[in-house]
Amino acid sequence: MVLPVCDHYSGVEVRMRKSLQLQAEMTQEFGACVFDVTLDCEDGAPVGGEIEHAHLVKEMTSSAAPEARLAVRVHPVDHPSFFDDVDLILGRVHSRLRHVMIPKVESVADVETATRALDQAGALNLPLHVLIESPAAVHRAFEIAAHPRVQSLSFGLMDFVSAHGGAIPASGMGVQGQFTHPLVLRAKLEIASACHANGKVPSHCVVTEFSDLNAIKVAATKASRE
């Protein structure tokens, strides 16, 4: 399985459009798509404006260039807007998407809930990417990765650190701390091992020092080689 080396999330309209434009420009420059664009409903939709945001994502997906590599991050399966996201977006433009990202997955039961919803919406063959964001989810990573619909596991670093209630300092989210703090490093290893055991793709977490190209290079190198 081959996926682009980066998945770029954006949820604000102007940034979503800019991301799609940048993807097209870099695809032309390098002759291949070097990053996916994931249109974000979870963090992108304003409270109370979830339906309107879902319509916007649907419209942007349907009007994107045919060669664009697009995905959508929907709300978690226990969020009131999850089924609206599935119905309004995946039920109408799933053929234009490469995958759907399901955040805050805690168990195989969450994966099954998402799978049933996608199937009922007609997105029968759309792969699932899941975000592992809690200690309990890390504990169940092998079971989650074994699900046949799951294509990739991603590590939700910030929510994972937050879930520890101060046991992991903020430095654990930095480009150095995320590779040295025992609890964070253990989570990364569990996710990677679960993916390798099941033939899935492990995806590294965010790098907050995005303006530091050397920091990004160091993080990407460590993630791919260690």
Predicted regions mapped to residue ranges:
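Expand to "…catalyze enediolate/carbanion chemistry for C-C bond making/breaking, isomerization
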Residues: 1-226
